[in-house]
A protein has these predicted regions:
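Domain-start "cap" segments at the beginnings of catalytic or binding domains
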Residues: 23-86, 311-341, 368-387, 495
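Extended hydrophobic packing segments that form well-structured cores
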Residues: 24-76, 88-89, 490-555
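Glycine-rich phosphate/diphosphate-binding loops that line cofactor/substrate pockets in enzymes
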Residues: 92-113, 140-143, 369-373, 415-417, ...
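Histidine-anchored nucleotide/phosphate-binding helix
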Residues: 118-142, 404-415, 423
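Short internal beta-strands
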Residues: 142-155, 423-426, 502-506
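Acidic low-complexity segments
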Residues: 144-196, 551-552
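Conserved, well-structured core segments that form the ligand-binding/active-site neighborhood
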Residues: 173-373, 380-383, 403-408, 414-416
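C-terminal catalytic subdomain
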Residues: 391, 397-499
Length: 555
């Protein structure tokens, strides 16, 4: 270990260090005037771009439409190496990491998988920076019984290249594959059942993670939904345990991003408390700014009224060129995108104290205060969600991203009123990745095409979760666990119950919308007219202009 990972490896040269200043804690104030983030359409000739899968639309909006933009990009930490060192040695609710370490101890490090960030970061990933610093400290203490586990939960296994992108080449070469590997939720010998919570929820988790002397969790927080008590139960759990918080009854009582009103997070907290009774955990959480797009896509980081001549030219050339490209080429281009995200905070120690600070820093970057709900919510659906990195946004994942995540990007109450209408643009298709999404395709063909009744769908869940073929593909190939197909469908359940209509604009294959329970429109204006049938002739309309990811705090 010492030869491959010498002391001080976590230190980076000045040229590698990120620039600007470290964020102050969230103080409840916006860093920019809200009126710069919320605009109203004043002229019917104005046009706005909408994400449309691996492409874009250029649309007019009705006069009076409220357009909500993400906050500007916050400056990153000036000296990341120093910030990580400070976090590890000045933790919250815990002794310093160096004080927890002793020669001969057994240490397990877990890290968030490729579902974060979106898109993947330009190297170095913040998890790499944290891992290198942690491993340097372990090396200094003479600790060599170290395993590093990708906390994939029931997601598909990460490929060697995907793991290397997150952890960096030095960590990868030193530990892969014997001591750097994906969590396996179906490896019975390396899973341990710890009992039940006081609500009867099974607590089942990776054996190595709880039978070590110290578990270190390295997190990347992209939204308030993640991190905290969610990290270990989801990332290192099994179907037997995860089913308790990934089900329609719980999700119907869950605000994904507002954990104060989330039954899912209450369940995760109960499960995580049992886990923490069995192993000492040192949590390291990080946040990043919203620098989502590389230099050649910077026009997507700006509002239309801020576009330069070059931005407009670049956008329209890209939009029209993408129209004539084959789908496979468009997907390859978009999935090659690497975001220039930079770290804005790092904090370590006790799970609850750490996560409180993480959420404060997320709010500083992501929250836009908004007055009032709307009747019709417009959104452009991009090519990428948490479950299709380097893959395909199949029909099930469209439901998870639209009625699931996009609908839930709020605090307090949804941006659209109950009984309102969600309209999104996406070239809806019937494509599934042949390796990653085997259970999704079968779920779509054999369950959703027959019924959308939730009770009937839930009755199929265990069949998918225990199917030997899906289990083998999850363990030996790169397919999602069988249970994840129905789980992804459940993700949109609250919105499906809450809204009167969901309308998809310009689908490529219209009958897919019928299977999903959506209506279709050939244009955005047609969709708005269709929505008026249920919300009335003079609706309030809001265009939720994302990505970058942000949250509306609705009053």
């Amino acid at each position: 270990l010492n030869s491959s990972f010498p002391k001080g490896i976590g230190k980076r040269s000045p040229s590698e260090r990120q620039t600007e200043k470290m964020l102050p804690p969230w103080d409840g104030e916006m860093s920019v005037e809200v009126d710069k983030l919320i605009r109203y359409v004043e002229d019917e000739r104005e046009r706005y771009y909408f994400h449309y899968g691996e492409g874009f639309l250029w649309e007019r909006l009705p006069v009076g439409t409220r357009v909500i933009y993400p906050p500007p990009t916050l400056p990153p930490i000036e000296d990341v190496d120093e910030a990580i060192e400070h976090a590890l040695e000045h933790p919250y609710g815990s002794e310093p990491l160096s004080a927890l370490l002793r020669r001969g101890m057994k240490v397990t490090i877990a890290f968030d998988d490729i579902s974060l960030s979106l898109p993947p970061m330009q190297p170095p990933d913040v998890r790499q920076l944290v891992l290198e610093k942690v491993l340097s400290k372990l090396s200094e203490k003479g600790i060599d019984d170290i395993h590093i586990i990708g906390a994939i939960g029931l997601h598909r296994r990460m490929t060697p290249a995907e793991i290397k992108h997150i952890v960096g080449e030095r960590v990868f070469k030193a530990f892969y594959p014997e001591r750097l590997y994906n969590h396996d939720a179906e490896d019975k010998e390396n899973i341990v059942w710890l009992g039940k919570t006081d609500m009867g929820e099974d607590v089942e988790v990776n054996r190595r993670a709880v039978e070590c002397d110290l578990l270190i969790y390295v997190n990347l927080n992209l939204t308030p939904m993640d991190g905290g008590h969610k990290s270990i139960p989801t990332g290192l759990g099994t179907y037997r345990s995860i089913r308790h918080h990934h089900n329609p009854d719980v999700l119907l009582q869950t605000s994904l991003m507002d954990t104060r009103h989330s039954e899912m997070h209450r369940s995760l907290e109960r499960i995580d408390r049992v886990i923490h009774e069995h192993v000492r955990v040192f949590h390291i959480e990080t946040t990043i700014n919203n620098a989502t797009f590389p230099w050649y896509l910077l026009y997507l980081q700006r509002a239309e009224h801020e576009h330069t001549v070059w931005d407009r030219l670049n956008f329209h050339i890209s939009r029209n060129a993408l129209k004539v490209m084959p789908t496979s080429l468009r997907r390859a281009i978009f999935h090659a995108t690497r975001a220039p995200y930079k770290m804005t905070s790092v904090q370590a120690g006790d799970v609850e104290e750490v996560h409180k600070l993480t959420i404060e820093n997320l709010r500083k970057q992501q929250v836009v205060p908004v007055e009032g709900q709307c009747d019709i919510l417009l959104a452009g659906m991009p090519y990428l969600g948490p479950y299709n990195v380097n893959s395909i946004l199949n029909p099930i994942l469209v439901n998870a991203l639209g009625p699931g995540y996009i609908f839930h990007l709020f605090l307090n109450k949804p941006l659209v009123r109950e009984g309102g209408v969600l309209i999104f643009t996406y070239p809806l298709h019937e494509d599934f990745h042949p390796v990653h999404q085997v259970p999704h395709k079968d779920f779509y063909e054999h369950v959703l095409k027959r019924t959308r009744d939730m009770k009937e769908i839930v009755a199929h869940e265990e069949e998918f979760a225990t199917n030997p073929r899906y289990i083998e593909l999850y363990r030996r190939s790169y397919s999602f666990h069988g249970a994840h197909a129905p789980f992804d469908w459940y993700w949109g359940y609250r919105a499906q119950c809450y809204l009167s209509k969901i309308i998809v604009v310009k689908p490529r294959v219209k009958h897919v919308a019928q299977v999903l329970g959506y209506e279709t429109a050939d244009s955005l204006s047609d969709a708005i007219e269709m929505a008026k049938d249920v919300v009335g002739p003079n609706p309030s309309i809001t265009y939720f202009h994302m990505p970058p990811i942000f949250l509306c705090e609705v009053k």
